[in-house]
């Protein structure tokens, strides 16, 4: 565990432990880091980073701050909007993003929030990269240059990515559940856009012997 990032990201009370400035700097570092990584691999296209968030009021603030940091460093930001952490991990992997960012503090109180960074494989970000993010947050690195002119990153509405994840969930739902007495689905406010679509499929299936509970 580092100074800022714990076992499940950077969490704390919004505006105190985790501020808009923190989010901006995380975006600045990630945009710069993944652009530099691409350049070393002979790829001059801007880094692509996908962002999701939960329904906390502060999530919008952190989303804007992250986008500002990413685009200022020359990376392109793709917005899934309100969604779930698994959807960000899935889309980061299947749509070849450099990384994904989920803005959420999970079960923490409503006034908390968090930033979880997921690598392009849909897994937790590598520890050595987290160490470098923390060094940048603490001012232990040289200032990252700003992208200029046409190198400034773009921001894209990527609700289509969320729909792709819904399609993946539906593909799971079409498997046989014969013999199962209970199916449990987790639900928070962030799950609602996904759950509404998937629920339509459940309602159309003959599952007279199966009880579905949402928790």
Please provide the spans of the model-predicted regions.
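Active-site catalytic microenvironments for nucleophilic, acid-base chemistry
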Residues: 33-36, 94, 201
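Gly/Ser/Thr-enriched, mixed-charge loops and adjacent short helices
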Residues: 13, 113-215
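Conserved beta-strand scaffold positions in the cores of enzyme catalytic domains, especially
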Residues: 4, 77-79, 100, 153-156, ...
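Active-site flanking residues adjacent to catalytic metal/cofactor-binding acidic residues
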Residues: 7, 53, 103, 184-187, ...
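Ferredoxin-reductase
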Residues: 39-121
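An N-terminal, well-structured beta->alpha segment
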Residues: 1-68, 72-73, 154-181
